[in-house]
Amino acid sequence: MDFSQLSGLLDGVKKEFSQLEEKNKDTIYTSKSGGGMVSVSFNGVGELVDLQIDDSLLEDKEAMQIYLMSALNDGYKSVEENRKNLAFSMLGNFAKL
């Protein structure tokens, strides 16, 4: 494989990655904690797109903080796991070439 072929291959990988990232923006990951009292939603690129807090938690700051941290951490882990899977998938496709 010469340099021009490698360059073309890398351009193809970049384009595929960009398309996957764009598609990933539309994927939503939702995590809940406290029996659903707190719900957070992230898109596939890790942006927080929704946050729901049950009104009963507004008077219990400590519980709200714990539930928020739990839901946020779980949501972030889901996004990161998806990103790892996409990366491995792309590497697998690259290795086949």
From Swiss-Prot:
One function term, GO molecular function aspect: DNA binding
Subcellular location: Cytoplasm, Nucleoid
Top-level taxon in the UniProt lineage: Bacteria
SUPFAM superfamilies recorded: YbaB-like
Record's keyword annotation contains Oxidoreductase: no
Record's keyword terms, sorted: Cytoplasm, DNA-binding
Gene Ontology CC annotation, any one: cytoplasm
A Pfam family reported for this protein in Swiss-Prot or TrEMBL: YbaB_DNA_bd
Family membership noted in the UniProt record: Belongs to the YbaB/EbfC family.
SUBUNIT field: Homodimer.
HAMAP family: DNA_YbaB_EbfC
Function of the protein: Binds to DNA and alters its conformation. May be involved in regulation of gene expression, nucleoid organization and DNA protection.
Protein name: Nucleoid-associated protein Hac_0048
Organism: Helicobacter acinonychis (strain Sheeba)
